[in-house]
């Protein structure tokens, strides 16, 4: 990773329940060079619509990267030809190359996975009462991680 905003990494942290029983799926997006967390949005599901909305907002705020590196889970990849999903086709149309790590090799996105470990420890133990309150925790974490270097 040779320059800011060239390669972004993205992943869902994995679902968990808030104290009211609602599932939360944190979508995280990181600049691969600077390790700046561009976004962490708690979604109600890992749907195309929600994921595309988050990326659209990030593109508007930070511009378009050249590459987005993800794992092989939905909505990033499918079992179709070349594993292209509707999301990755959208990225291609925007001029972004979707780069998939090898299946079952999360270490190929190791920096991102390490950030996830810290995110989980700092924001979900215990989980917040609601998804809205959980998002506030994610927002505080982003501020501390990006601006205060506390992790």
Identify the meaning behind each predicted range.
Residues 1-30, 36, 44, 48-57, ...:
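Mobile-element integrase/transposase regions
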Residues 87-151:
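Charged alpha-helix within mobile-element recombinases
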Residues 58-80, 102-104:
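Acidic/histidine-rich, metal-coordinating catalytic segments
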Residues 81-86:
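Charged helix-capping and loop-helix junction motifs
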Residues 11, 29, 35, 55, ...:
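Mobile genetic element proteins and their domesticated derivatives, centered on retroelements
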Residues 18, 38, 78-79, 116:
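Active-site-proximal flexible loops/turns
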Residues 16, 76-77, 108:
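Short, small-residue-enriched loops and turns at beta-alpha junctions
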């Amino acid at each position: 990773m040779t320059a800011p905003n060239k390669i972004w990494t993205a992943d869902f942290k994995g679902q968990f329940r808030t104290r009211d029983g609602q599932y939360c799926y944190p979508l995280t997006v990181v600049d691969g060079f600077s390790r700046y967390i561009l976004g962490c949005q708690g979604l109600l599901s890992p749907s195309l619509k929600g994921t595309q909305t988050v990326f659209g907002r990030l593109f508007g705020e930070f511009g378009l990267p050249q590459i987005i590196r993800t794992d092989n889970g939905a909505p990033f990849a499918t079992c179709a030809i070349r594993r292209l999903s509707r999301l990755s086709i959208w990225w291609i149309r925007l001029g972004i190359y979707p780069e998939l790590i090898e299946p079952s090799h999360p270490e190929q996105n190791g920096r991102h996975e390490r950030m996830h470990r810290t995110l989980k420890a700092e924001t979900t133990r215990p989980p917040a009462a609601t998804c809205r309150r959980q998002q506030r925790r994610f927002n505080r974490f982003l501020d501390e991680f990006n601006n205060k270097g506390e992790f």
